[in-house]
Amino acid sequence: MPSVDTVMDRLREEYGVPDPQDRPDPVLSLIQVILSQNTNDDNRDRAYAALMDRYDTPRDIMAADTDELADTISVAGLHNMKAERMQAALEQIEAERGELSLAFLDDMDLEEAKDWLTDLPGVGPKSAAVVLNFTFDKAAFPVDTHVFRVSKRLGLIPDDATRESAHDVLEEATPDDRVYEFHINLIRHGRAVCTAPVPHCSDCFMTDICPYFQDDDNPRK
């Protein structure tokens, strides 16, 4: 099995080091994450643009008619559930903190911040990791469908790993200062080469270290 360091370095050689993102407002980042659940980036972005077009602030979103809110974000799919989750999460933030702000998470350690976020309605380990990594630059490792697939094929996580356990395995194995880079480059590789359901192994630069490719039952060898 290849080491995380080896895979990270191979990916860096191919895809480079991703540019750092501007830190979004944490509450708006949470809203985007809820919109992104079970949809693609394009639909998430369209739903978020429609949301920002109709409502000026997170408080306006929280106070909106739920059916109207759901209609506004319908392009994201599961819009009724997402509208309810969004408003419930915002209401819980304000109830517990006295304001619609997540800035206090910056002062928490990683595990404490994760626990606080995953206690919100509709926020699981991946959603919490996205907010903490992209907004607060904490070493939380988001595991989406691409990261999960590529990591499993490369043997970086156990065969029986779940999405939830994969977060912990990859977080522990990845240096804090390379979590964002590794996350982004695994996604790039998953979209370009290590696709589902059939990967483009003939185009891959890691076949010499990939257990999935080297398996005797792999017809793409």
PLM regions and their residue ranges:
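Catalytic cores of DNA base-excision repair glycosylases
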Residues: 2-220
